[in-house]
């Protein structure tokens, strides 16, 4: 099953990369939400009685994307944290603590690109 998950993740990355290049205009919040859910699934830890998933996510955005989100960053962060809570609840996953989404600027990134780092449990 992990082969299929790996293939799906790679295919998803290629498709997202294609659309990012084909349709410039920066990062969209829905991309960030999908990436969080995918990383929760990929990085889950199966315990004896529970499945644990990461609860802290650090997005590094290009300067133009970060600037575009500046006015709505607080609301976007709350919405993405809610996605973490709801996804965990729907799938029966456990969080170690409250979800936390952080945005930082990375001047080496071009508009429409971002990186996501997880703070593992």
Annotate each predicted stretch with a short phrase:
Residues 119-121:
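Conserved small/polar residues in nucleotide/adenosyl-binding loops
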Residues 83-117:
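Alpha-helical bundle protein-protein interaction modules that mediate dimerization/oligomerization
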Residues 1-47:
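N-proximal, solvent-exposed amphipathic alpha-helical segments enriched in charged/polar residues
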Residues 33, 52-54, 96:
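A general secondary-structure signal for short beta-strands and their flanking turns/coil
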Residues 10-20, 48-71:
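Short glycine-rich, basic-tinged beta-strand/loop micro-motifs
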Residues 36, 72-92:
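Short, non-transmembrane amphipathic alpha-helical segments
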Residues 2, 48, 95-99:
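Short beta-strand elements
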């Amino acid at each position: 099953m992990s082969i299929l998950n790996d293939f799906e993740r790679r295919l998803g990355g290629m498709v997202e990369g294609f659309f990012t290049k084909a349709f410039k205009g920066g990062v969209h919040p829905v991309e960030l939400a999908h990436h969080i859910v995918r990383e929760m699934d990929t990085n889950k830890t199966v315990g004896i009685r529970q499945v644990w998933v990461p609860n802290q996510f650090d997005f590094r955005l290009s300067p133009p994307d970060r600037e575009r989100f500046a006015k709505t960053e607080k609301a976007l962060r709350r919405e993405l944290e809610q996605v973490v809570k709801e996804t965990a609840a729907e799938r029966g996953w456990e969080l170690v603590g409250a979800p936390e989404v952080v945005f930082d600027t990375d001047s080496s990134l071009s508009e429409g690109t971002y990186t996501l780092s997880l703070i593992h449990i």
